[in-house]
């Protein structure tokens, strides 16, 4: 079983920066909050202490999650991947909705990098699954909650 997680170079850097921030800034701040809260006496009814401990749990959980993802990361540099003119992980694709006649441009990225507002869609999304492997001028049928939607591939970029 392949448990590697595909990521772009930018995606890996983003996770590394978050991990560093959690370890060097957030974790020490939480520890300081716990120490200060302990000084307020009885821990059973000390809401500051319990809140800090809960925050510590979330922080440590996120650190472990990021470390695991980075250990399984398969970094894909789109500029060095043979693409054969088809949509692949990391490519930027411009598509035309054949029903509404609207154009959209998306980049296909890893799960942690996806951000629909920034037009970054996960490789595991229905849209990506329907687009991967297609060439310019192909029509992709994407299953959506409101039914099938057809998109024509207008442009593929590998940058």
Curated annotation (Swiss-Prot):
Entry-linked InterPro entries: GreA/GreB_C_sf (IPR036953), TF_GreA/GreB_CS (IPR018151), Tscrpt_elong_fac_GreA (IPR006359), Tscrpt_elong_fac_GreA/B (IPR028624), Tscrpt_elong_fac_GreA/B_C (IPR001437), Tscrpt_elong_fac_GreA/B_fam (IPR023459), Tscrpt_elong_fac_GreA/B_N (IPR022691), Tscrpt_elong_fac_GreA/B_N_sf (IPR036805)
Underlying gene: greA
DNA repair keyword on record: no
Keywords: DNA-binding, Transcription, Transcription regulation
Entry superkingdom: Bacteria
Species: Buchnera aphidicola subsp. Baizongia pistaciae (strain Bp)
Protein name: Transcription elongation factor GreA
Keyword Phosphoprotein included in the entry's annotation: no
GO biological process, alphabetically ordered: DNA-templated transcription elongation; regulation of DNA-templated transcription elongation
Protein family membership: Belongs to the GreA/GreB family.
Pfam families found in the cross-reference section: GreA_GreB, GreA_GreB_N
Gene3D superfamilies: Transcription elongation factor, GreA/GreB, C-terminal domain (3.10.50.30), Transcription elongation factor, GreA/GreB, N-terminal domain (1.10.287.180)
Functional description taken from the UniProt entry: Necessary for efficient RNA polymerase transcription elongation past template-encoded arresting sites. The arresting sites in DNA have the property of trapping a certain fraction of elongating RNA polymerases that pass through, resulting in locked ternary complexes. Cleavage of the nascent transcript by cleavage factors such as GreA or GreB allows the resumption of elongation from the new 3'terminus. GreA releases sequences of 2 to 3 nucleotides.
A GO molecular-function annotation: DNA binding
């Amino acid at each position: 079983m392949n448990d590697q997680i595909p990521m772009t170079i930018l995606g890996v850097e983003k996770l590394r920066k978050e991990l560093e921030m959690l370890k060097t800034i957030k974790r020490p701040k939480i520890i300081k909050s716990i120490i200060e809260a302990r000084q307020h006496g009885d821990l059973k009814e000390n809401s500051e202490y319990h809140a800090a401990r809960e925050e510590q749990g979330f922080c440590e959980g996120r650190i472990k999650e990021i470390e695991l993802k980075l250990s399984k990361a398969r970094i894909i540099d789109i500029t060095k991947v043979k693409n054969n003119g088809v949509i692949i992980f990391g490519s930027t694709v411009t598509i035309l909705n054949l029903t509404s006649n609207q154009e959209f441009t998306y980049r296909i990225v890893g799960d942690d990098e996806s951000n629909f507002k920034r037009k970054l869609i996960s490789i595991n999304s229905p849209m990506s699954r329907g687009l991967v492997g297609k060439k310019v001028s192909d029509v992709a049928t994407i299953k959506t909650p409101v039914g099938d939607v057809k998109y024509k591939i207008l442009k593929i970029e590998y940058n």
